[in-house]
Amino acid sequence: MTPTYTHEWLCQSVVEQTQFAVIFSDRDGVIRFWNAGAEAMFGYTAGEAVGQSLDLIVPERHRARHWEGYRRVMATGVTKYGREMLAVPAVRKDGTRISIEFTIVLLRAPSGELLGAAAIMQDVTARWQQQKQLKERLAALEAKLEQVGKPA
């Protein structure tokens, strides 16, 4: 027997059950949708996040650059991050900084009007920390090799 389900149910289930954070913000950068993955990643419930500015998760020192890019995308309707993953720092409710990667989907009304952007995100903090440690180890080994090769 073939299971019956609607396209709408399938899409809703994927967004609700994925471990990835899925956030939709309107043209002004106000959060309008926040899934369970976003709750787990950032520590805010949907009730706390919806209606707030994206500043909620953007570290203060990165906000000017963030808003410059966001406004450009909303004005032009074009983003290069629909095909590429963007890696940026973010901040959790408890103030902890994390590293995230995300892609953007621009959402339009049937009329073609740009409504805002959905971001699909994953926390890559552990991977970034491992890469940093590997780079530090490599630098230390290279320094030792340099010393070994020098005459006494």
Regions found by a protein language model. Give the residues of each.
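PAS/LOV-family and closely related PAS-like sensory domains
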Residues: 7, 37, 46, 55-101, ...
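Sensory modules in modular signal-transduction proteins
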Residues: 5-29, 33, 37-39, 82, ...
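Sensory-domain boundary capping and coupling elements
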Residues: 102-104, 121
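PAS-family sensory domains
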Residues: 113-123
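Sensory-domain boundary/capping and coupling elements
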Residues: 5, 9, 128-146
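Non-catalytic regulatory/interaction regions at protein termini and inter-domain linkers
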Residues: 1, 69, 139, 143-152
